[in-house]
């Protein structure tokens, strides 16, 4: 192994074990590169332990990467480390990006509750949108695990039935496979992300790839990933008016041309590969002339391209 690059997978690893790993790498002169995807763990209401793990990893890293300038500022504030900012690449297979979408007479506005993990609270969002849903169809999906989630104490099954009676297209199913996710995204036009906290989301990128307009909360840094409508939602509650305005904008908005999106994603993917190669080479102490602050990313503190 020449470089260890950590993205995920350390959620259950005690900080003292991470310190041992960092010391082992340092002893063998193997650089550690860390990409900070989540400053808050979306699966737990309290991210104290997650932050402690990040503190160990970020402190030991030869290079730190994150996905948005706002997250980079947080990393610098918390741990005094500057980050290379590289955007999240495409999520859907590149050959499927930009596929033609059939216009619907009645657009579908969707909410996905997933397994009702800690940062997801779809109920206030649904309650706010139900009175407005006459001009479009409202769909709610949930993974089967949601029925056994801690939030199920709030009578999830009864809630779902009430929404069905109110006209919501409610679907409970196994967690999506890759193919099922692509099919789902082809069936919806707008996807509201019901996150009360968090940092970044692959769903934002999947929506962009599929030509779906995401509506994202103003918590975390979801709004920096793509130019999607934003509403106010966080640990302190929901601004229902801002949600309804954002959904109205999303339903009426134009989508970028599919061919243009695929071309941009191909170019971005190659650029990110080049940047990561440069980061690895710099971590290893070898020369590299690729530069870091052009195109899609920059070192924190330098101006991002318009």
Q: Which ranges hold each PLM region?
A:
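Acidic donor-binding loop of glycosyltransferase active sites
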Residues: 183-199
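Short hydrophobic beta-strand element within catalytic cores of glycosyltransferases
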Residues: 213-218, 223
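Extended catalytic core of nucleotide-activated donor transferases of GT-like folds
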Residues: 1-60
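Short Ser/Thr-rich beta->loop micro-motif in glycosyltransferases that lines
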Residues: 113, 173, 192-196, 217-218
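Conserved catalytic-core segment of nucleotide-activated headgroup transferases in glycan assembly
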Residues: 102-162
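Donor nucleotide-sugar binding/catalytic pocket of nucleotide-sugar-dependent glycosyltransferases
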Residues: 59-97
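Nucleotide-activated donor-binding/catalytic signature segment of Leloir-type glycosyltransferases, i.e.
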Residues: 151-182
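A charged, aromatic-enriched C-terminal amphipathic alpha-helix characteristic of glycosyltransferases
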Residues: 237-289, 296-298
């Amino acid at each position: 192994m020449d470089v260890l690059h950590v993205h995920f997978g350390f959620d259950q690893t005690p900080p003292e074990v991470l310190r041992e790993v960092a010391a082992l790498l340092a002893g063998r002169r193997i650089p550690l590169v860390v990409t900070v995807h989540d400053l808050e763990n979306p699966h737990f209401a309290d991210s104290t332990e997650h932050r402690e793990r990040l503190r160990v990893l970020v402190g030991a890293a030869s290079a730190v990467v994150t996905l948005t300038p706002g997250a980079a500022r947080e990393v610098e504030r918390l741990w005094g480390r500057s980050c290379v900012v590289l955007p999240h690449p495409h999520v859907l297979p590149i050959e499927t990006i930009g596929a033609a979408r059939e216009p619907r007479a009645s657009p579908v506005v969707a909410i996905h509750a997933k397994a009702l993990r800690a940062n997801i609270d779809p109920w206030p969002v649904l309650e706010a949108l139900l009175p407005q849903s006459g001009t479009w169809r409202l769909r709610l999906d949930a993974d089967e695990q949601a029925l056994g989630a801690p939030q199920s104490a709030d009578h999830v099954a009864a809630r779902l039935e009430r929404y069905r009676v109110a006209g919501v297209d409610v679907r409970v199913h196994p967690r999506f496979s890759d193919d099922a996710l692509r099919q789902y995204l082809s069936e919806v036009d707008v996807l509201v992300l019901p996150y009360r906290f968090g940092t970044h989301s692959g769903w934002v990128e999947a929506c962009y790839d599929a030509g779906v307009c995401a509506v994202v909360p103003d918590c975390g840094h979801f709004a920096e990933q793509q130019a999607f409508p934003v509403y106010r939602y966080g640990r302190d509650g929901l601004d229902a008016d801002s949600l309804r305005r954002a959904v109205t904008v999303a339903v009426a908005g134009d989508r970028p041309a599919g061919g243009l999106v695929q071309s941009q994603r191909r170019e971005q993917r190659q650029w990110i590969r080049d940047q990561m190669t440069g980061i690895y080479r710099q971590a290893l102490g070898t020369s590299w002339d690729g530069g870091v602050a052009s195109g899609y990313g920059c070192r924190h503190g330098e101006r991002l391209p318009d």
